[in-house]
Amino acid sequence: MADTRRLRVACVALLLAAVTAACDTKAQFAPSLPPAAGFRVDDGVLKLWTGTVCDGVTGLTLIFDSGTQQSTEQVWTAPRPGVPVERMDLLRTTGPPAPDSGGSLQVQKPLPADYDWTKAGSLNFSVDGPKAYGARVDVAQILRESARHPSGSYLFGQRGWMDASDVQRENQKSFLTICTPDPK
């Protein structure tokens, strides 16, 4: 009877070890490198730089304070087949909520008139149309640090402030721009 008990314990331990070893902690469709997009504020305007061109964009979404009661979003859309996007003025820090992009992307869902995005903790950004990844950035850091960096440098989330040569050198090595295919 003791031998049967030991055999059961050994089988359970072996099964537990196999199940634990088989667990993958990464999301099934997560890219092999962290994705990022660049943001900065110049002359009171929140600016986007995707780092590389995103072709065929049919929509852009900014979500402030995602997952909280204060969560709110602004959405831009463009007709199919979409438009190329690399740099874009997104929002003003004061005054009317959105500058006129003058392009094919038009505000479909504006932020509420009384919403002050500069008080948000985070900004989540996503692109519709091409295969793309989302990006997240700290709003206070953008506002606080933009003036300290040259106008060609943008905050790429956890990657920090990067200019064109930094993005070209590091894209597909230490991070992915949001529209860069995963190299793996």
Model-found features: residue ranges?
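Post-signal peptide N-terminal regions of Sec-secreted extracellular proteins
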Residues: P31-L33, R40, E170-K184
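Short, surface-exposed binding/anchoring microloops in extracellular/periplasmic proteins
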Residues: P34-M88
